[in-house]
């Protein structure tokens, strides 16, 4: 595949994409079309925390495919794997946090967290850490500290601020509405 096709037909989400053509992955490595291995510190934006092509993950996916691929993540249908996962998670949480909101991406989880924070507190302001990545939706961009990625999409969500970590003076940004 030509790099020119990549830049011509696929939207870029960062100013300087790596543009490595990946042919396959195994364990903690991704490989380019010349079979050069790279240690994968991105891990599918944390989706591959067990590594690529882990045998137990492959087996679980194949077993599930024999039943059904996907019906819905929003709690409309009883799906045994989802119920088992949420039950397992609840064993490690306080009684007041026994329910789990399942999503299909980290960005969607961030959007859910933003809504939950506003709903649970009744407050409008959101404080986030500078230099944190949360995704590419409007809500996620609003609490991301990378101005270079945010600029083209303004105006973003109102009442959001990004503060520096480990800087006590930044705590002044917290108000009664945070």
Predicted ranges, named:
Residues 1-2, 6-9, 70, 88, ...:
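Intrinsically disordered, low-complexity boundary segments flanking structured domains
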Residues 1-26, 81-82, 175:
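Active-site-adjacent loop/helix segments that line or gate small-molecule/cofactor pockets in enzymes
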Residues 19-42:
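Active-site and channel-lining beta-strand-loop segments
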Residues 22, 53, 81, 163-166:
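Short secondary-structure boundary/capping elements
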């Amino acid at each position: 595949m030509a790099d020119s096709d990549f830049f011509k037909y696929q939207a870029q989400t960062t100013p300087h994409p790596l543009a490595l053509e990946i042919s396959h992955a195994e364990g903690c490595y991704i490989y380019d079309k010349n079979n050069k291995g790279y240690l994968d510190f991105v891990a599918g934006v944390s989706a591959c925390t067990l590594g690529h092509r882990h045998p137990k993950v492959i087996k679980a996916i194949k077993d599930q495919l024999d039943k059904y691929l996907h019906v819905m993540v929003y709690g409309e249908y009883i799906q045994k794997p989802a119920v088992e996962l949420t039950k397992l998670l609840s064993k490690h949480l306080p009684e007041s946090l026994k329910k789990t909101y399942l999503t299909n991406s980290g960005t969607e989880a961030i959007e859910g967290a933003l809504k939950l924070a506003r709903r649970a507190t009744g407050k409008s302001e959101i404080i986030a850490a500078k230099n944190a990545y949360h995704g590419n939706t409007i809500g996620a961009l609003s609490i991301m500290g990378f101005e270079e990625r945010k600029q083209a999409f303004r105006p973003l969500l109102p009442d959001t601020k990004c503060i520096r970590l480990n800087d006590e003076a930044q705590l002044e940004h917290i108000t009664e509405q945070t």
